[in-house]
Amino acid sequence: IYSILNKDQINKLEQTKDLDCSYELPGVSRYRVNVCYQRGRIRTTIRTIPTEIKSFQDLGMEGGVFEKICQIPKGLILVTGATGSGKSTTLAAMIDYVNRNRPNHIVTIEDPIEFVHPDKNCMVTQREIGADTPTFASALKHVLRQDPDIVLIGEMRDRETVQVGLELSETGHLTFATLHASDAIQTINRVIDIFPPGQQSQIRTQLGFVLEAVVCQQLLK
């Protein structure tokens, strides 16, 4: 596995014993890679990332609901579901729709970058945790200096990331983000519960002002 990792990735793996990254074989495909240790040895999981971004029609998301969501000028849009439920695929379709239909600057912050979005009607800046910025929170602290209209937060993992995501939505930006939650009610509770009790009333008010949509999906087998 070391043959496909760069020096920084190898250092991170040896220090933390865990690594998430992406890898590309030009002309073949892109891959999401997880490397960890088990029983003192390296274990690797590699998943193929589709090179083609599906449209809403391709994904069976008809009826115009997702198109309307992507036309919202500002606020917070949460895409939630269990691991492997297709959140990344849905978000990629949403970002691609915006990219084709709005003249904006999109900044994505991902760990790792999965779907690559070339500039279409939008300018797209894609930043990867580890390669381009140390953490989600660090990237979000500086994102306003990059003059975005739309921000994609690959995952709201901690309190600081959630807080900055809410603040971005309050300042007139359209913010997309993912969470692990099984339904819309749990999604809202998870956002609130990540904060201490003394701050939760303020977060409820803040969330009430900025939350525009919750998309919760399940993969049917």
Where are these regions (language model features)?
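Short, flexible helix-loop junctions that flank or precede catalytic/ligand sites
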Residues: 1-221
